[in-house]
């Protein structure tokens, strides 16, 4: 059995932790959001790619869901002495990965090749693909003091902590971007696709904004796990961003966002009253993943439902 997972943010990596315990890792492919990627000085941040790499290698700092557990911060502290105070605290080993990306990109190496080098360096059996080798940037249009300002998502979330009146979200360059090498083949060869419980707008939306990928998904069986329980996102700015795009902050809003491609929507048990407004199959489960057992159970519920169809 082969499955392909669409991932971004922190919700989907938690579910990946469950899947990698119950199926052979070589049967898992992951297509990862790169809409939040950005340069900071001489390093290249690709937060969602790095989180997936660290998740599969059991190195992820699962308290912050960013960077490596047990990392040191010697470089970060030294930069502070020079008056360069990084808003995002980057560990030394994590910085090396980001330096590798920056150097490779400047030398013309495609992102898909860079990620594969890093994957192999960590001895990972699962395939990990950036959504595109071309830059597609998530931009957030905000209003501040009656002025409209267009921000990179990184600036909106890291520097401003999401504290702004959001008017809209755009995926810059998505009209021209192509799927990265291996992405379409992974989709076509999968038994089913899983959209993880990530922010639909800025974690999954950039992937779907590439028409080549979205069209390929329409030909496959697609599961999607709602990242919203009741009327509250499990984490992050999903509520604010869904409102800005005109979707209700609920499982119904998640369905409306994915309705062109989703066949089975996975909802939390507490959202049983939402079924009447959802026009696809619904699987109810505990989608709040606090422990490894929660993650494994949710992964197994999805797998069992697929096998029973």
Curated annotation (Swiss-Prot):
Reaction it catalyzes:
(2S)-lactyl-2-diphospho-5'-guanosine + 7,8-didemethyl-8-hydroxy-5-deazariboflavin = oxidized coenzyme F420-0 + GMP + H(+)
The keyword Transferase is annotated on this UniProt entry: yes
| Molecular function via GO | LPPG:FO 2-phospho-L-lactate transferase activity; magnesium ion binding
A GO biological-process term: F420-0 metabolic process
Quick one: which residues bind 7,8-didemethyl-8-hydroxy-5-deazariboflavin?
Answer: 50, 89
Asked if the keyword DNA-binding belongs to this entry, the reply reads no
- PANTHER family hit by this protein: 2-PHOSPHO-L-LACTATE TRANSFERASE (PTHR43007:SF1)
Per UniProt, subunit arrangement is:
Homodimer.
Mind telling me what this protein is named?
Answer: 2-phospho-L-lactate transferase
Task: Supply the source organism for this entry.
Answer: Methanococcus maripaludis (strain C5 / ATCC BAA-1333)
**Taxonomic lineage from the root:** Archaea, Methanobacteriati, Methanobacteriota, Methanomada group, Methanococci
Q: Which gene encodes it?
A: cofD
């Amino acid at each position: 059995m082969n499955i392909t997972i669409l991932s971004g943010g922190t919700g989907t990596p938690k579910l990946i932790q469950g899947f990698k315990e119950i199926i052979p890792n070589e049967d898992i492919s992951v297509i990862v959001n790169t809409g939040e990627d950005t340069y900071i000085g001489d390093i290249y941040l690709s937060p969602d790619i790095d989180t997936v790499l660290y998740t599969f290698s059991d190195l992820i700092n699962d308290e912050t869901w960013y960077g490596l557990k047990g990392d040191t911060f010697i470089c970060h502290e030294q930069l502070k002495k020079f008056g360069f105070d990084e808003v995002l605290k980057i560990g030394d080993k994590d910085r090396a990965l980001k330096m590798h990306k920056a150097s490779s990109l400047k030398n013309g190496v495609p992102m898909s090749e860079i990620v594969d080098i890093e994957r192999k360096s960590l001895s990972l059996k699962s395939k990990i693909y950036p959504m595109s080798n071309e830059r597609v940037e998530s931009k957030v249009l905000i209003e501040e003091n009656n002025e409209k300002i267009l921000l990179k998502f990184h600036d909106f979330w890291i520097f401003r902590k999401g504290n702004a009146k959001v008017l809209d979200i755009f995926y810059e360059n998505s009209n021209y971007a192509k799927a990265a090498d291996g992405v379409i083949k992974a989709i076509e060869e999968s038994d089913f696709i899983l959209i993880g419980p990530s922010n639909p707008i800025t974690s999954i939306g950039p992937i779907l904004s590439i028409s080549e990928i979205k069209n390929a998904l329409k030909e496959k069986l697609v599961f999607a796990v709602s990242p919203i329980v009741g009327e509250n996102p499990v984490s992050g700015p999903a509520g604010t961003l869904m409102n800005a795009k005109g979707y209700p902050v609920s499982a119904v809003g998640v369905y409306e966002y994915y309705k062109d491609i989703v066949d089975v929507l996975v909802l939390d048990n507490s959202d049983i009253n939402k079924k009447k407004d959802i026009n696809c199959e619904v699987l109810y489960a505990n989608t709040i993943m606090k422990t490894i057992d929660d993650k494994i159970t949710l992964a197994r519920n999805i797998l069992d439902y697929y096998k029973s169809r």
